[in-house]
């Protein structure tokens, strides 16, 4: 049920002219509720007025939009409106321009000055882009251009003021503390946006609008460009670095890791699709692997590591043994792991802290099954997220897997997509998993008996679209939903959408 504050805020933002006249008399405690109502209601004129008169030092999207205190929490799950995000950015720029031009007599006189715009933690797009929402890449480009524009205009204004003073023979005034707004943001860059982001980061340190990166993601970017951007990031603000599809190889990773050592708060390092294969190393490459492991060990705050799609057969002990602290999240999808790798994990210090584990794409049906079950038993008391997509797990393995999986009492997410499990197998899995009180999302595979030709089951997700008996598949889905109703677990989502968990921030688990 919505609160009275929420209902009143929604009514107020519908009357822009009246609200604008009343803003000077409005208690500052109402601003968060008004902002949320205006943002979710797409009241852009109201949003701009609220931002330009914001009475607090911090304006945080995540805290304002995800608070359940003032508005319907169901609305907060919607993806942010592109127009509303642009409006807030424009409002901050206008606010800053007025403050720089008018100084202490400007519109913020008597109010606490806005110092931080926090745009981190916003809902991200799924697989399909919605033209009415704003992707992380688009937000990055928009903010970069805004930073450059504000910096240029400020420099021009400073030069004009200086010229006027010289022409009037007025001595320079004592330097005052610079007025600026810090923008805490997650950045996503590729070769298309590299130039504008680099320019923005270069001017950011002395611009009135200063970018502070929390999570940095780069795709399909050259080694030199990636290293250059890492050098421009604030060492104290970076929490996550995600480099993917960059074809870096061991040599490239060893060039970049020294640039990361300065990030004292770096908790997450994601290096999927880095073209690393340790199965046949030359002596020089062996030295490179040892250097890579040694430099990983220098990242003292690291608690999340993704080495997906690198062939790491038999080398987990070497790579993870030197880390300064146990990992809480480990993603090893399609890493060609051996039994000795999983046995090492079961005995390592990481075993006591792992909350997220992704072993997708490793064949758990044969030699890896026993060490996998042993590892799962060891981490069952604190595991929150398990992804075993495309691991060749079939009905024959469920009798061994289910008893251990049911011990994972804190499990929130389970990924079983693209495993050759039958409809009967899925029913058995559901009957067991409804006992787990924290489990709210299961991504299950298309049952093998729903294929037009079950003998030609494919483990490749891209080939699954056209080979089903769609009527049978629909019936199975409906039956699973009915089972959830009978078990009184309507809070649990069972889906075949493998992208549904894309927006999950594992650092917030």
Curated annotation (Swiss-Prot):
LRR repeats lie at residues 111-146, 210-234, 235-262, 263-298, 299-323, 324-355, 356-374, 380-407, 408-432. The lineage of its organism: Eukaryota, Metazoa, Chordata, Craniata, Vertebrata. Pfam families: LRR_6. Keywords: Cytoplasm, Leucine-rich repeat, Repeat. This is Leucine-rich repeat-containing protein 14. It is found in: Cytoplasm. One of its GO terms (cellular component) is cytoplasm. Belongs to the PRAME family. LRRC14 subfamily. It comes from Xenopus laevis (African clawed frog). Transmembrane segments: none annotated. SUPFAM superfamilies: RNI-like.
